[in-house]
From Swiss-Prot:
This is Phosphoribosylformylglycinamidine cyclo-ligase. NCBIfam families: purM. GO terms for cellular component: cytosol. It is an enzyme of class 6 (ligase). It is found in: Cytoplasm. GO terms for biological process: 'de novo' IMP biosynthetic process; adenine biosynthetic process. SUPFAM superfamilies: PurM C-terminal domain-like, PurM N-terminal domain-like. Its main location: cytoplasm. Its EC number is 6.3.3.1. Pfam families: AIRS (PF00586), AIRS_C (PF02769). Keywords: ATP-binding, Cytoplasm, Ligase, Nucleotide-binding, Purine biosynthesis. Pathway: Purine metabolism; IMP biosynthesis via de novo pathway; 5-amino-1-(5-phospho-D-ribosyl)imidazole from N(2)-formyl-N(1)-(5-phospho-D-ribosyl)glycinamide: step 2/2.
Length: 352
């Protein structure tokens, strides 16, 4: 008969010895509380640390519709880990969620985060969460909850992952779903800050092949600064537009670029015809294409190419919209127009 192993030879085990430090996690929760407090807005009914975040719907809505969105930052996180720079990656996380929610016509209300790592490093975590708080302030949303998961053995020592969750509200009759888009409508692009949070698996492959240090100077700053520039948050700008412009549709340009994202808000039998001469690609995209010998079609299908958000509206509103965007500090231009199409035609045509 097989004997049982002698457990007396080994010291007692604990959760901490298994790799999960509950006290460190509790300290982090305390550090998050002042960050969340800075994002507080009307409607928040609870603080950080409870089992659920409470938020009261704003008054004045006749038929309020809740809009939810969730997203992550992708492999841009790997660059942050390699460079040990975590102060802006939280802004990226918030941006990816709130920019999606605002495209429906909704006002983003509150945000929650999920932070998972193999070994909890509170200094690293505080940088990340401070960035999340900064993003929430920029988007005027409340940080009302989240989850920190320390999972030894699942992630390498310094690696971590992030996910964000946002909820907004819109009056039912004011939902923007593309149904108002008409042939002849104008498309206006609002500038991005760079690649934002998409295409980084290709970017990292290009960097590995080129063997160029991220400390290298690029456009009066380091290449690292250019690639880690946080995703633009368009919420304040778009909310102002809603008050003055009849916006027919909005597309947040993320993974898949203009090619994949603009069709998501177009009715059947329409296509977006985009004039690529309407704007100059930011230098980082020229650099990436050259270093990686990336075909032009792949560039359009992977990156935002300098366009972070696309607006669709009546041509009569072009001048007013561009003037308002300029007054709000945005760089914007006429991107193209909506034309009729057949099922066989592409949903987006980019003219040289």
């Amino acid at each position: 008969m097989q004997s049982m192993p002698d457990s007396t030879r080994h010291p007692p085990l604990s959760y901490c010895k298994a790799g999960v430090d509950i006290e460190k996690a509790a300290d982090l929760v305390e550090a998050i509380k002042p960050i969340a407090k800075r994002t507080r807005r009307p409607g928040v009914l609870s603080g950080i640390g409870g089992f659920g975040g409470l938020f009261e719907l704003p008054r004045g809505y006749k038929q309020p519709v809740l809009v939810s969105g969730t997203d992550g930052v992708g492999t841009k996180l790997k660059l942050a880990v390699e460079l040990n720079r975590h102060d802006t990656i939280g802004i990226d996380l918030v941006a990816m969620c709130v920019n999606d929610v605002i495209t429906t016509g909704a006002e983003p209300l509150f945000f929650l985060d999920y932070y998972a790592t193999g070994h909890l490093n509170n200094e690293q975590a505080k940088q990340i969460l401070t960035g999340i708080g900064a993003g929430c302030e920029l988007a005027e949303v409340a940080l009302i909850g989240g989850e920190t998961a320390e999972m030894p053995g699942l992630y390498r020592q310094k690696d971590y992952d992030l996910a964000g969750f946002c909820v907004g509200v819109v009056e039912k009759e004011k939902i923007i779903d593309g149904s108002r888009v008409r042939v002849g409508d104008a498309l206006i692009g609002i500038a991005s800050s760079g690649p934002h949070s998409n295409g980084y698996s290709l970017i990292r492959k290009i960097l590995a092949r080129a063997k160029i240090p991220l400390s290298q100077s690029f456009e009066n700053k380091s290449l690292a600064d250019g690639l880690l520039a946080p995703t633009r948050i368009y919420v304040k700008t778009i909310k102002r537009l809603f008050s003055e412009i009849n916006v027919h549709a909005l597309a947040h340009i993320t993974g898949g670029g203009l090619i994949e994202n603009v069709p998501r808000v177009l009715p059947s039998y329409t296509q977006a015809v985009i004039d690529s001469n309407g704007w100059e690609w930011p230098a980082i995209f020229h650099w990436l294409q050259k270093q990686g010998k990336v075909p032009i079609e792949e560039m359009w299908r992977t990156f935002n190419m300098g366009v972070g958000m696309v607006l669709c509206l009546d041509k009569k509103e072009i001048r007013k919209t561009l003037e308002l965007l300029a007054a709000l500090g945005e760089t914007a231009w006429i991107l193209g127009e909506i034309q009729s199409s057949s099922e066989e035609q592409p949903r987006v045509t980019i003219t040289p």
